[in-house]
A protein has these predicted regions:
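Short beta-strand segments
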Residues: 9, 38, 273, 309, ...
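Terminal amphipathic helices with adjacent charged low-complexity linkers/tails
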Residues: 61-63, 76-96, 129-172, 261-289, ...
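Conserved catalytic alpha/beta cores of large enzymes that bind or transform nucleotide phosphates
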Residues: 38-136, 141-142, 175, 180-191, ...
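Short, small-residue-biased leader/transition segments that mark boundaries at the very start
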Residues: 2-3
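Conserved phosphate/anionic-ligand binding catalytic regions in large, soluble enzymes, centered on
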Residues: 11-57, 135-160, 240-245, 315-336, ...
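Conserved alpha/beta-domain cores
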Residues: 15, 124, 294-544
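Acidic, glycine-rich flexible loop/linker segments
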Residues: 144-145, 151, 155-161, 165, ...
């Protein structure tokens, strides 16, 4: 090369588009079949430093070579309240960059389209394959050409080094009042006193073993972070500086809480729990918890197929190392209650909704979606996909929603669409809702979510199960409604099970067997309905 040769490289104009960070492994559980992507508007420094709460996406790697599938496991809209851009000449006293507030439209929109999310994920897999190890990458989108670029790639240094033969789990035994929540980093629990700092220069005030609470962190904070037992920040995502350093130090952290520095105070005793899935929770007081460690290579093999019961999608990846034969029960209503949070009819009949507070919250939750019903379908499908992905291709049995009317009423907008029942336990629940005009439109959204999960995302290991089906005639009606919504038993390998939890399911077992591919025994309901004993009655507990 001649000494006068000059390399010319294009500047990626992410200042007029977006940028972020990407990992080819799940940063919290070490699950190696997912890609984690964070994204924000403008230059990437804000994401790296944790100065903004970015969008977050998760993608299932094994399906990325199938162009017809969209294996996006999770999409979370971040606040993205500011963006970093290039400063004009003479602005900012010589600084080449500056932060400006984002517009309302930017805050309410995802930075990346589904196609761009998948494109980045494919880049991650290619880079990981090239280097032969999990990778930590930074990316940027050029606002002029619309092209995506990888601007940095380095080895992931935490999860890839963890001993995969041991499984350590934390469980809260009793906790105080929930004070606030954010994104969890790690899976541990810590207790102690709060030390609230606004600047790394306050290092002399920090007490060893305290819980560090601050707005955000940068490299100047590392000496303090090393002395903390846990870390809580107002801002940042799972790929921010605070999250990365906490992970490397083995500390539980909760980032992106929004207002920890306003709600918590010096000397306050709190419990930091990252053991409950994606959302870390700060509880008041010193809670009791237990830690269990299992050497997986010492677990003996069994002749019987052993499957897990799971409800929380966010916690599914924590258990991926277990030698499970699949998921024996995934409760859809848990995903609706904790993920979707909205009554389906409050979305299909939004214009009829009279609760203005509920409408305002629904508007907030459905930001970024062209149709409100898409929010329900996508959120439900993605929540269930995180369970189905963990042990794919082993089966995942998903039970359709089994709320009672009083439980449906607690969903956003639900009270307007649910009748009052004296005994919801044996009232309008399970199969009887699915074909009734009072809920049929809601069940259609559930079916659309299952269809998306199987056909568009690729999780053909999902088996659907119908709860509380009282008669063969009711079974026929439910199967017909499912068929009308694109879920036909036997088509494309589609299997449908039924809960055996009513005496009629046992008495008419042969008739039910003609209509379904399998049974799952619901011992609680079957016992109480056979004996006529309320399972929640303390007085009759000895008879149950």
């Amino acid at each position: 090369v001649c000494s006068s040769d000059l390399g010319v490289q294009m500047m990626v104009r992410s200042d007029i588009s977006g940028s972020g960070v990407m990992f080819s492994i799940d940063t919290e559980s070490g699950f190696d079949k997912t890609v984690l992507i964070n994204a924000a508007w403008g230059l990437g420094e804000n994401v790296v430093q944790g100065a903004v709460d970015p969008d977050e996406y998760q993608v299932y790697k094994p399906f990325l070579d199938k162009p017809k599938l969209t294996p996006i496991l999770a999409k979370s809209l971040g606040a993205k309240e500011k963006k970093m851009i290039y400063a004009r000449a003479g602005h900012g006293h010589g600084s080449p960059i500056r932060n400006v507030p984002t517009s309302k439209a930017e805050r309410e929109a995802f930075v990346l389209s589904d196609a761009e999310i998948l494109e980045l994920a494919r880049y991650a897999v290619t880079i990981e394959t090239h280097y032969g190890q999990p990778m930590d990458m930074e990316w940027a989108k050029d606002g002029e050409s619309g092209l995506l670029y990888i601007v940095q790639a380095r080895p992931e240094t935490v999860q890839s080094r963890i001993d995969t033969h041991a499984l350590k789990s934390y469980r809260l035994k009793k906790a105080g009042v929930k004070l606030l929540e954010g994104l969890s980093v790690g899976e541990a629990i810590a207790t102690g006193e709060v030390c609230l700092l606004h600047s790394a220069a306050e290092i002399e005030r920090f007490v060893d073993g305290a819980i560090l609470v601050t707005s955000t962190t940068d490299p100047d904070w590392v000496p303090i972070m090393k002395r903390a037992s846990a870390i809580i920040t107002d801002h940042g995502g799972r790929t921010s500086h605070a999250a990365i350093v906490s992970r490397e130090l083995g500390l539980p952290a909760i980032v992106g809480t929004g207002n920890a520095t306003h709600l918590l105070h010096d000397g306050q005793e709190v419990t930091v729990s990252c053991a409950e899935g994606d959302h870390g929770i700060v509880y008041e007081g010193i809670a009791e918890f237990e830690v269990e460690e299992v050497e997986l290579h010492e677990v003996p093999p069994t002749k019987t197929r052993v499957m897990l019961n799971l409800a929380n999608p966010a916690a599914a990846a924590r258990w991926w190392r277990l030698p499970s034969d699949g998921v024996g029960l995934a409760r859809m209503e848990f995903v609706i209650n904790n993920g979707v949070r909205v009554h389906p009819l409050a979305l299909t009949r939004y214009d009829q909704l009279t609760d203005e507070a509920a409408k305002a919250e629904i508007d907030r939750l459905t930001r970024g979606y062209a149709r409100r019903t898409d929010y329900f379908v996508d959120t439900l499908a993605m929540g269930l996909s995180r369970i189905a992905a963990t042990w794919y291709p082993n089966p995942t049995i998903v039970r359709m929603s089994d709320f009672k009317t009083n439980e449906y009423a607690e969903l956003l907008g639900g009270r307007q669409f649910e009748p009052h029942e004296e005994n919801p336990m044996i009232g309008w629940r399970g199969a009887s809702r699915y074909y009734a005009e009072g809920y049929k439109a809601g069940f259609a959204l559930e079916c659309q979510a299952i269809r998306k999960l199987r056909d568009e995302m690729g999780f053909d290991n999902v088996i659907v199960m119908i709860p509380f089906c009282r008669s063969p005639d009711e079974a026929d009606r439910v199967l017909e409604v499912m068929r009308e919504n694109g879920l036909e038993r036997g088509k494309g390998g589609m299997q449908v099970y039924v809960m055996c939890e009513i005496p009629s399911n046992v008495v008419l077992a042969e008739e039910f067997a003609k209509r379904f591919d399998g049974f799952s025994i619901g011992s609680n309901d079957l016992t109480q309905l056979t004996l006529g004993v309320d399972r929640d009655s303390g007085t009759l507990a000895g008879l149950f």
